[in-house]
Amino acid sequence: MDWNRVEGNWKQFKGNVKEKWGKLTDDDLDVIEGRRDQLEGKLQERYGYAKDQVRKDVDDWFTTLK
């Protein structure tokens, strides 16, 4: 699976993202709209993660979707 599937079906993945990263608000999820760069940016903002940590966390989450 590639990220385009997440972006194209964002409404289906929003609940999973909210469950994994509960500090993200519904407004955050609407802004993200399935875009990986937006997701990573919001995670950095809400959790104070470094860019490398965010990328690893998103990669780990993404692999669970396959």
UniProtKB/Swiss-Prot annotation:
Organism superkingdom: Bacteria
Entries under SUPFAM superfamilies matching the protein: Hypothetical protein YjbJ
InterPro entries linked to this entry: CsbD, UPF0337_stress_rsp, YjbJ, YjbJ_sf
Family: Belongs to the UPF0337 (CsbD) family.
Protein name: UPF0337 protein RPA4217
Lineage per the UniProt record: Bacteria, Pseudomonadati, Pseudomonadota, Alphaproteobacteria, Hyphomicrobiales
